[in-house]
Amino acid sequence: MNRELPDVQAAFRKGRGARDQIANICWIIKKTREFQKNIHFCFIDYAKAVDCVDHNKLWKILQEMGIPGHLICLLRNLCEGQEATVRTEHGTTDWFQIEKGVLQGCILSPCLYNLLAECIMQNSSLDEAQAGIKIVSINNLRYADGTTLMTESKELKSLLMKEESEKVGSRLNIQKMKITAHGPITSWQIDGGTVETVADFIFLGSKITADGDLLLGRKL
């Protein structure tokens, strides 16, 4: 499974982690300023990302990525037919079937979600998009379900993976998405919601300034 993932995905992978992505984004900001380039970021957030994975679409994605059929069958048997009950102050609910999402606490779940996220990115044709950063051949950084889109132009909105995300059961959480721009940009309206534009931003638990400086004092 790891072979299907690009270098920009750093979550749940040996030798990669949040600190690498934080260092990468700080370096990108500083380099664009050094070369006097504009830089625009959009921090994508999904609503209940791991809980909304459509099982049937996940099996199809794994098949298209070349995962052997017997392994897909094992994963299907593991995920399907699961039941849960909710404990409340008034007692417990009736048992109900879990029809979506990857299993909480399962060591395979992060890998499965990474593959789903990779499918969204591939189908969004980001590699073919003209937007991106020219001093480095990159237009996104990823950590699990957290995706950061980046470009030198104002056409950041053209990189959004909204349609492809919805095809696999994931919905953009407009209220938690943020834009930061080192250059002119107007606010976005998506599905009736406004994406907030900010100067400093929280990236993987660390606050990064508009100059690309990392403010210590926040814990990862």
Task: Outline where the language-model segments fall.
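Nucleotidyl polymerases of mobile genetic elements and RNA viruses
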Residues: 1-220
